[in-house]
């Protein structure tokens, strides 16, 4: 059965399907929208008591519901200076060292950090010998992405690609999954060196958004696009630890890359398959360089 599911993903018109679902999710269809939201809440056992708007009818579209805000204070941010926090609600897929430019995906599968970053060689070089973490956001999860530490945006790259599902089953069977799917790469400068936040698209992910540029995808194409940003002066974009940096309209995955020696140890309990909660301790940082 697993082989059938994977084979279907290769055959499906994934981009067309994702655009269609995106249009439906953006539609403001009144009672139909509310009915779809109620079904989704029941199907995935979503705890709406955490949402700023807990009533399904409060959302004009399914996208509004899916990118719902949480109640203030429901995810307290660990403000300890030497603590990096979880950027999302989800589950750790994999984490560990970047070895010779290779990142572990699943048993028998690795992929290139250079390819992940859109073949930006200078960016990849900055993370040689560093660490990575991959976090999967399930449909039930809160889908806003926050900063794990304070950082100033220096570069953003849009990389076109496939739209395979990014669930654990697909990660085990599709080689180079996260480096072949459509993605947005944001590079931040921090006290602990560069930080890459890679927002990976997936089947029926209607779009990826950032707080500084709005919707990045769609539209899609064959071309890699890069934007560079000033890191000093009035136009610099600096986000504090815990600030929102982006969101997925329907679920996906975040891959983080850290500079060599930025991380001392991952926090207690942070390991493959561990549940993550935005704002809780993710890693212990070394002293700034």
From Swiss-Prot:
UniProt GO MF annotations: phosphatidylserine decarboxylase activity
Post-translational modification: Is synthesized initially as an inactive proenzyme. Formation of the active enzyme involves a self-maturation process in which the active site pyruvoyl group is generated from an internal serine residue via an autocatalytic post-translational modification. Two non-identical subunits are generated from the proenzyme in this reaction, and the pyruvate is formed at the N-terminus of the alpha chain, which is derived from the carboxyl end of the proenzyme.
Swiss-Prot/TrEMBL GO biological process terms: phosphatidylethanolamine biosynthetic process
Membrane association type: Peripheral membrane protein
Recorded catalytic activity of this chain's protein: a 1,2-diacyl-sn-glycero-3-phospho-L-serine + H(+) = a 1,2-diacyl-sn-glycero-3-phosphoethanolamine + CO2
Superkingdom in the source lineage: Bacteria
Pfam families xrefs: PS_Dcarbxylase
Role: Catalyzes the formation of phosphatidylethanolamine (PtdEtn) from phosphatidylserine (PtdSer).
Name of this chain's protein: Phosphatidylserine decarboxylase proenzyme
The species this protein was found in: Shewanella sp. (strain W3-18-1)
Designated gene of the protein: psd
């Amino acid at each position: 059965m697993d082989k059938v599911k994977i084979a279907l993903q290769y055959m499906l018109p994934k981009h067309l399907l994702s655009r269609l679902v995106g249009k439906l999710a953006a539609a403001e269809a009144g009672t139909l929208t509310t009915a779809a939201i109620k079904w989704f809440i029941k199907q995935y056992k979503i705890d709406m008591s955490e949402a700023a708007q807990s009533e399904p009818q409060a959302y004009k579209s399914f996208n509004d519901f899916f990118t719902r805000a949480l109640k203030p204070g429901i995810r307290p941010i660990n403000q300890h200076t030497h603590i990096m926090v979880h950027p999302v609600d989800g589950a750790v897929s994999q984490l560990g060292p970047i070895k010779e430019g290779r990142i572990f995906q699943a048993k028998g599968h690795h992929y290139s950090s250079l390819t992940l970053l859109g073949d930006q060689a200078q960016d990849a070089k900055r993370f040689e010998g560093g660490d990575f973490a991959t976090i999967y956001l399930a449909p039930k999860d809160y889908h806003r992405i926050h900063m794990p530490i304070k950082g100033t945006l220096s570069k953003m790259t849009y990389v076109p690609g496939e739209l395979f599902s990014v669930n654990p089953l697909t990660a085990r069977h599709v080689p180079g999954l996260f480096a072949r799917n459509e993605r947005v790469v944001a590079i931040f400068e921090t006290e602990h060196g560069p930080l890459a936040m890679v927002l990976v698209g997936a089947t029926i992910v209607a779009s990826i958004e950032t707080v500084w540029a709005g919707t990045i995808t769609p539209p899609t194409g064959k071309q890699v696009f890069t934007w560079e940003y000033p890191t000093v002066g009035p136009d610099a974009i600096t986000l504090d630890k815990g600030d929102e940096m982006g969101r997925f309209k329907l679920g996906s995955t975040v891959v983080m890359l850290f500079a060599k020696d930025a991380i001392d140890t991952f926090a207690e309990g942070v390991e493959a398959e561990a549940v993550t909660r935005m704002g809780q301790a993710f890693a212990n940082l070394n002293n700034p360089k």
